[in-house]
Amino acid sequence: MPSVVPQERQQVTRKHYPNYKVIVLNDDFNTFQHVAACLMKYIPNMTSDRAWELTNQVHYEGQAIVWVGPQEQAELYHEQLLRAGLTMAPLEPE
């Protein structure tokens, strides 16, 4: 009688990629209007009210997380805000 050898099951583990934080830093040369306008221009679904809240947070707390999400999109928004003249922290995983 042939013996049956159970086959090992392979575990499939899904790797979750981290989200990245786009952080704007306070500086002495960008105006409130410029920061808020850049946030509305480059960050998807950014409302005027939210842009101004974040701009105030940048000013009074020194920084604000303006967007969190997948690395590729975070890199794009980070680069766009940087090119617009905003002072940016390096991207960091959440």
Curated annotation (Swiss-Prot):
Binds to the N-terminal domain of the chaperone ClpA. This is ATP-dependent Clp protease adapter protein ClpS. Involved in the modulation of the specificity of the ClpAP-mediated ATP-dependent protein degradation. It holds the Pfam family ClpS. GO terms for biological process: protein catabolic process; proteolysis. It comes from the Bacteria. It comes from Thermosynechococcus vestitus (strain NIES-2133 / IAM M-273 / BP-1). Belongs to the ClpS family.
